[in-house]
């Protein structure tokens, strides 16, 4: 039977790489993004949607999944709290946290009913450390990690596997300005123990392993993949 994955943030970066690896391995992939449809080959279905708005079109379009990948996210330009408005804070939480809680509920209910399914959130090293973003980003990713762990505890007996992935510096469209002249790319690579940025395809490979069903005794881990950054 063909397995089905739903991926948010599918049009670029990590989400695009995730879609690619699952399609290559025969999965049916539903992808959501507010950007335009990516060029992917295989059993791919796309919905252009802002995840902070009405989600009912999603549930009509994709009614049941084996795997839910919460990959969409937003950054905050490393702003400290006194430079962050209430509106900006609420918007970042709407993307990074509340879109996850809202999208999870209907699919989780069905996973619990059939005693099967996997949910993976895209956390960050900022889910456990300061300095991986500004105050709004760090707070939203801490909240996401807490939600992930509690969800994993609450639904472990229902055989729903739940994980978080915590990347460090990943070379994506979101971080593209760091690679412009005068950007932070070289400094970040130099400060990373392995000497380079992580690539989206490496996150996708980890995701595929977690979704394989071969790690049945793992539950609730927030798995760091940051080139050794958090060892310092």
Per-range role (PLM):
Residues 75-90, 133-136, 176-180:
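Conserved mid-core segment of classical short-chain dehydrogenase/reductases
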Residues 156, 161, 218-220:
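Short, small/polar-rich loop/turn modules that mediate ligand/substrate recognition or access, typified
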Residues 104, 140, 148:
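Active-site helix of classical SDR
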Residues 192-203:
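A conserved structural motif in NAD(P)-dependent oxidoreductases
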Residues 208, 219-232:
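Short C-terminal tail/terminal secondary-structure segment
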Residues 124:
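Residue(s) in the substrate-gating loop at a strand-loop-helix junction
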Residues 11, 19:
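N-terminal Rossmann NAD(P)H-binding glycine-rich loop of SDR-like oxidoreductase domains
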Residues 82-101, 120, 144, 194:
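Catalytic Tyr-X3-Lys loop
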């Amino acid at each position: 039977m063909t397995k089905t994955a739903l991926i948010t943030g599918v049009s670029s970066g990590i989400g695009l790489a995730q879609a690619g690896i699952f399609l290559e391995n025969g999965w049916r992939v539903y992808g959501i993004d507010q950007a335009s449809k990516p060029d992917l080959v295989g059993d791919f279905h796309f919905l252009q949607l802002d995840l902070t708005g009405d989600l009912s079109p999603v549930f009509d379009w994709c009614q049941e999944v084996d795997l839910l990948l919460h990959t969409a996210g937003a950054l905050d330009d490393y702003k400290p709290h006194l430079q962050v408005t209430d509106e900006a804070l609420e918007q970042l939480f709407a993307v990074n946290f509340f879109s996850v809680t809202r999208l999870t509920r209907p699919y989780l209910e069905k996973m619990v009913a059939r005693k099967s399914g996997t949910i993976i959130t895209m956390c960050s090293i900022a889910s456990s450390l300061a300095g991986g973003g500004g105050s709004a980003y760090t707070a939203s990713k801490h909240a996401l990690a807490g939600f992930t762990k509690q969800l994993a505890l609450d639904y472990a007996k229902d055989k729903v596997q739940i994980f978080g992935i915590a990347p460090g510096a990943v070379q994506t469209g979101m971080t593209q300005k760091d690679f412009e002249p005068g950007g932070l790319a070289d400094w970040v690579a130099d400060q990373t123990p392995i000497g380079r940025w992580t690539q989206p395809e490496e996150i996708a490979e980890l995701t595929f392993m977690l979704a394989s069903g071969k790690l049945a005794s793992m539950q609730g881990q927030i798995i760091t993949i940051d080139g050794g950054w958090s060892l310092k």
